[in-house]
């Protein structure tokens, strides 16, 4: 058999970690990226990376509690064995990064400094100022460049993924890519292809994601037969800065370091915020969620900000919706830790956030859903069976997916600082699985007939020629703006079925109009118009997966919030016995789980997405009510434990701890 070769699509943290691991195992890797790998979207990650550590362990923390926080925060929609494995690997991943030279912040004693992020009561988050993603990316790229110098890695930067190559047995044998300078289209034979292509924020027009995060690559493999899981679950980050071009993230680290979210109790109060007395400030997260305060899970913080601005009419400004994120009370030493994000705000808003509270509003930020992938559970540890060939393999043999591109780890809502852990962990753990898969093959991609690769290239050249020669009266950029506005208005923070139906109708309309959208540039050199227009067609396909999944899921779970199907808390003023109310609530919660605690699986058909539902692996932790700020939570948990739970869970009120 010829030398082993893997095609890695994407040069962010997942792609670099996977490339590094595969090269260590002696596998040749072709690393394909639309941008220089150091400009992958992972570079924008700010806040930190989670793991249990010695200090939190002394306070009662453990990998099991990290695992529990993750599935609880994800509303139990996460498959549990992969999540447990990730939590178990957390300390090892951070130790590896430390040894690779990542400049993590340290305490005066020289230990790694930690901050607390949302959805947990422990300071698990290691960080490098407010530019953690950049530091991790640079460290991993340094390792990849070492393997590049030893001819185990070839980088294809400024190359775009167009599609996979599958043989007559449906086995993935490589990828078709395009040089974004010369516009050359070529085939890259590979014994496996790994999608490490990130999220799909551009479907919503403006988001905190980079402009390359169209979801186009994921949509292409979906259209080629890969299943897509939980597409309707997208995270709307509570704190972003509105901009004319895009939305800029203000990291959760700002709240983790003591930042406070508030609005004046007087609507649209025009006074200098520093002159507004404490008694006239509404710290709504702290009042509603005294245990977690400003660090409730992101889906909850986002809905509260939306409610305060839209339903309560307490937006700071009248022309745009926003609340204050206030760091002015923090000392200069804390501001220094956050320089990375504070400088971004000052650069784009012209205001020094060290002296004046920031104005922020929620924005699309992360894709919990993604390409469906498989795994094998280790029955002894409850985690993953190391080296199992199907770990992170899609339903197409030889095609893998890792990082934000896949759907496993974060369920209905991702906890802050779990993303950097999951991306790197996935790259590392999938490497041996890919090697074992390749070793099981009877022949390599290099042995496949040339006609297989020539035919794949011809197909994509024909598609490009059709696009270049297209005529019509539509404009791709205007269509993208319409798509983004519709998706943002109707399929983000609050979702109503009538509005989602309107969105699906609009998507179909845009899809028809797209066929009449010619290129503004027919050039054969660095044609960005071609790349964008092609991606728009793929965004339209994926938008329908998202919207249809949202329409059919008649419940509220994590980031998917439908007020018409929300199970409200108890009413102590109703006169009805609280225990009886709690019992009815628990019955409704259990019935809802019986119906909807399942992953949405989309399969592409010419008529549109075909949706089915997959049971979630809950073999390690039984689901329980997600009671952040829920009225009557203590009574609900008391009844749940005594009458409904398969395994009793702790009901005492948690106390925030500091490490």
Residues covered by each model-derived region:
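An anion/pyrophosphate-binding glycine-rich loop and adjacent beta-alpha core
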Residues: 220, 226-359, 433
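Core beta-strand elements of the Rossmann-like FAD/NAD(P) dinucleotide-binding domain
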Residues: 2-4, 183-192, 395
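Glycine- and aromatic-enriched mobile tails/lids
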Residues: 1-5, 18-21, 25, 36-38, ...
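Conserved redox-cofactor binding core of oxidoreductases
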Residues: 93, 98-184, 196, 205, ...
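Conserved N-terminal glycine-rich FAD pyrophosphate-binding loop of Rossmann-like flavoproteins
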Residues: 35-69, 235, 246-249
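Short beta-strand "acidic-cap" motif of Rossmann-like dinucleotide-binding folds
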Residues: 27-33, 230
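Glycine-rich loop(s) and the adjacent beta-strand/alpha-helix scaffold that form part
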Residues: 192-248, 317, 410-433
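Glycine-rich Rossmann-fold phosphate-binding loop(s) that bind the pyrophosphate
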Residues: 10-13
């Amino acid at each position: 058999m010829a030398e082993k070769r893997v095609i890695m699509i994407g040069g962010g943290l997942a792609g670099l970690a996977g490339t590094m691991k595969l090269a260590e195992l002696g596998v040749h890797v072709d690393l394909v990226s639309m941008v220089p790998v150091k400009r992958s979207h992972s570079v924008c990650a700010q806040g930190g990376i989670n793991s249990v550590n010695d200090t939190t362990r002394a306070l009662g923390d453990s990998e099991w509690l990290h695992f529990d926080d993750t599935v609880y925060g994800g509303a139990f929609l996460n498959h549990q064995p992969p999540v447990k494995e990730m939590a178990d690997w957390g300390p090892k991943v951070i130790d590896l990064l430390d040894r690779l030279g990542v400049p993590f912040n340290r305490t005066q004693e020289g230990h790694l400094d930690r901050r607390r992020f949302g959805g947990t009561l422990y300071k698990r988050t290691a960080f490098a100022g407010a530019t953690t993603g950049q530091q991790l990316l640079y460290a991993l790229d340094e390792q990849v460049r070492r393997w590049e110098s030893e001819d185990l890695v070839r980088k294809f930067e400024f190359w775009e993924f167009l599609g996979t190559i599958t043989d007559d047995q449906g086995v993935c044998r490589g990828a078709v890519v395009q040089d974004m300078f010369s516009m050359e289209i070529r085939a890259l034979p590979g014994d496996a292809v790994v999608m490490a292509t990130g999220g799909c924020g551009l479907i919503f027009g403006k988001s905190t994601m980079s402009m390359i995060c169209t979801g186009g690559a994921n949509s292409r493999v979906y259209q080629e037969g890969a299943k897509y899981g939980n597409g309707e679950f997208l995270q709307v980050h509570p704190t972003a800065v509105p901009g004319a071009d895009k939305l800029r993230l203000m990291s959760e680290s700002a709240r983790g370091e003591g930042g406070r979210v508030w609005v004046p109790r007087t609507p649209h109060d025009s006074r200098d915020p520093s002159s507004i007395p404490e008694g006239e400030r509404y710290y709504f997260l702290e009042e509603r969620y005294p245990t977690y305060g400003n660090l409730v899970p992101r889906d909850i913080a986002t809905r509260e900000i939306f409610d305060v601005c839209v339903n309560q009419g307490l937006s700071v400004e009248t022309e745009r919706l926003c609340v204050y994120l206030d760091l002015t009370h923090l000392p200069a030493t804390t501001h220094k830790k956050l320089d990375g994000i504070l400088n971004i705000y000052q650069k784009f808003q012209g205001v020094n956030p060290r002296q004046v509270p920031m104005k922020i509003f929620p924005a699309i930020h992360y894709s919990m859903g993604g390409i469906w992938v498989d795994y094998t559970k280790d029955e002894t540890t409850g985690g993953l069976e190391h080296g199992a060939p199907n770990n992170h393999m899609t339903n197409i043999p030889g095609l893998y997916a890792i990082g934000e591109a896949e759907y496993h780890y974060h369920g209905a809502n991702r906890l802050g600082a779990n993303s950097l852990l999951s991306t790197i962990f996935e790259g590392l753990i999938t490497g041996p699985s890919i090697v074992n898969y390749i070793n099981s093959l009877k022949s390599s991609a290099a042995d496949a007939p040339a006609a297989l690769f020539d035919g794949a290239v011809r197909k994509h050249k024909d598609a490009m020629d059709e696009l270049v020669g297209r005529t019509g009266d539509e404009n791709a950029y205007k269509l993208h703006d319409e798509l983004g506005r519709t998706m943002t208005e109707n399929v983000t923070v609050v979702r109503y079925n009538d509005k989602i139906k309107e969105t699906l109708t609009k998507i179909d309309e845009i899809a028809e109009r797209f066929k009449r959208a010619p290129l503004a540039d027919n050039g054969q050199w660095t044609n960005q118009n071609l790349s964008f227009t092609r991606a728009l067609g793929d965004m339209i396909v994926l938008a329908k997966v998202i919207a249809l999944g949202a329409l059919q899921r008649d419940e509220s779970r994590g980031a998917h919030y439908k007020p018409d199907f929300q199970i409200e808390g108890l009413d102590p003023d109703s006169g009805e016995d609280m225990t009886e109310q709690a019992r009815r609530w628990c019955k409704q919660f259990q019935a809802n789980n019986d119906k909807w605690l399942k992953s949405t699986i989309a399969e592409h058909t010419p008529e549109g997405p075909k949706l089915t539902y997959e049971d979630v692996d809950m073999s390690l932790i039984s689901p329980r009510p997600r009671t952040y700020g829920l009225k009557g939570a203590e009574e609900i948990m008391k009844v749940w434990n005594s009458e409904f739970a398969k395994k009793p869970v702790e009901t005492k009120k948690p106390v925030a701890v500091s490490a």
